[in-house]
Amino acid sequence: MAKKAMIIKQQRTPKFSTRAYNRCKICGRPHAYIRKFGICRLCFRQLAYKGQIPGVKKASW
């Protein structure tokens, strides 16, 4: 889990627009963010295994 202070700090609008960055909507993780879903890869994996993300299935080739 991300530090509460960093999550709150990130929610404020930054002084310069280039300082803005994405965080996971579930756990607040700043790295490995998947834009299409708005969550990090770890939360994505958990939700995909539970079947809570529609249209996502395990790849097989």
UniProtKB/Swiss-Prot annotation:
Listed GO MF terms: rRNA binding; structural constituent of ribosome; zinc ion binding
GO annotation, biological process: translation
Instruction: Check the UniProt entry and state the signal peptide residues, or none.
Output: none
The cofactor note reads: Binds 1 zinc ion per subunit.
Q: Does the keyword Zinc apply?
A: yes
**Keyword annotations:** Metal-binding, Ribonucleoprotein, Ribosomal protein, RNA-binding, rRNA-binding, Zinc
> Taxonomically, which superkingdom?
Bacteria
Q: Which Pfam family would be a valid example here?
A: Ribosomal_S14
InterPro entries recorded: Ribosomal_uS14, Ribosomal_uS14_bact, Ribosomal_uS14_CS, Ribosomal_uS14_sf
The reply to whether Membrane figures as a keyword in the UniProt entry is: no
Residues binding Zn(2+) are: 24, 27, 40, 43
Q: Which GO terms describe its cellular component?
A: cytoplasm; small ribosomal subunit
Looking up Gene3D superfamilies in the UniProt record yields: 30s Ribosomal Protein S14, Chain N (4.10.830.10)
List, separated by semicolons, the cofactors it needs.
Zn(2+)
Q: Please describe what this protein does.
A: Binds 16S rRNA, required for the assembly of 30S particles and may also be responsible for determining the conformation of the 16S rRNA at the A site.
Q: Which HAMAP family match?
A: Ribosomal_uS14_2_B (MF_01364_B)
Subunit info here reads: Part of the 30S ribosomal subunit. Contacts proteins S3 and S10.
Q: Which family does it belong to?
A: Belongs to the universal ribosomal protein uS14 family. Zinc-binding uS14 subfamily.
The entry's protein name is Small ribosomal subunit protein uS14
| Organism from which the protein derives | Ruminiclostridium cellulolyticum (strain ATCC 35319 / DSM 5812 / JCM 6584 / H10)
